[in-house]
Amino acid sequence: MKNEVVYKQLTEKILPFWNAMRDDENGGFYGYMSEDLHIDDHADKGCILNSRILWFYSTAYMYLQDEKLLDNAKHAFEFLKTYCFDPMCGGIFWSVRYNGKPADTTKHTYNQAFAIYALSAYYEATGSIEAIAIAEIIYEKIEDTMRDTKGYLEAFTRDFRPADNDKLSENGVMAERTMNTLLHIIEAYSALVHALRKKVADPAKGDVRDELFMNVVENKLAAALELMRDKFYNSDRHRLDVFFDKEYESLIDLTSYGHDIEASWLLEWAAGILDDEEITESLHPISSDLVEKVYKEAFDGHSIVNECEDGDVNTDRIWWVEAESVLGFLKAFEREGKEEYRKAAHEILAFILDKQVDKREGSEWFEMLKEDGTPCHKPMVREWKCPYHNGRMCLEILKSGIEIG
């Protein structure tokens, strides 16, 4: 089979690892594994981690048709609806205790987006009306309380009063708007539109209200894509700027190579779902520009550096940056036919399999490596360390049918 090494990475490394993180006593999946592979069964559980696990198992099930994957997706869904979703104020918590009691009750727009992304995938995998209903409720909460007339805001208290955006701000700034949140709003709304179209096409499940709601979400998706194009894309620097104040003034000179290469294909994917010719045509040159910049500036022939701030390059190799780079270059090769992009995807995948993948039995990928390939002291699982990026990389490679492994 094509990309057999990728298939084995998915089925013999990534899936078994996350299967073992399932918490059958308290629900969901364990929230923390140390670098020495010790599971802390009393660690808080990040709701973003649970959403990404839900998305991963739902999507993996649709491709592999393994009932065990469906069971894990159902397990993650039950935890989301029972514990991650706030029955008092709505929306998704930032984290809960190991037993599901609320821990960090912050409501972050980014976190809501990933819940929608996951619930949409779960609906596509199962046809669960309950899942798509929760996704719609979260969408309405975002649109009603987590944005202003100019775009999307970031962090809120449990009852949706504005709060400092410490969770998605870094590098010494406190951002009121971020490229990262908007990118994943686009991702979430695209997935929701795709799921709603499936629902509307089924007379037993969809009705006129669903079609009207779908049209509203399509309009919001179009507006979000235009916002990314008009406010976040920096044509002079060939990148997406990262952190902004409320008036869309960029707060820092930062190039995030991982986000740029991820956005290069996610924006194309979203535009394809929206099927708006004008928006699609306006995004093509942006996607091409982002890929070319990453290829010329961040790719050393084997892997991708992390980011560049004020001319200072961070040369760490981050698991998700490498995974998204494989996918970004693969998608660029599909669009543009440039052999150097297929070769780049091949080389980065080889680097991942050689260096980023932890060869220890019962482990998965190292979160971060130094420039020389030495693993940094990072946990194997935490709220941000998840199967979303590397799992999606494997699934998209396999679905593409393009040999890069």
From Swiss-Prot:
One of its GO terms (biological process) is carbohydrate metabolic process. Optimum pH is 7.0-8.5. InterPro entries: 6-hairpin_glycosidase_sf, 6hp_glycosidase-like_sf, AGE/CE, Cellobiose_2_epim. Keywords: Isomerase. Its EC number is 5.1.3.11. It catalyses: D-cellobiose = beta-D-glucosyl-(1->4)-D-mannopyranose. Optimum temperature is 35 degrees Celsius. It holds the Pfam family GlcNAc_2-epim. One of its GO terms (molecular function) is cellobiose epimerase activity. It is an enzyme of class 5 (isomerase). Catalyzes the reversible epimerization of cellobiose to 4-O-beta-D-glucopyranosyl-D-mannose (Glc-Man). Can also epimerize lactose to epilactose. Belongs to the cellobiose 2-epimerase family. HAMAP family: Cellobiose_2_epim. This is Cellobiose 2-epimerase.
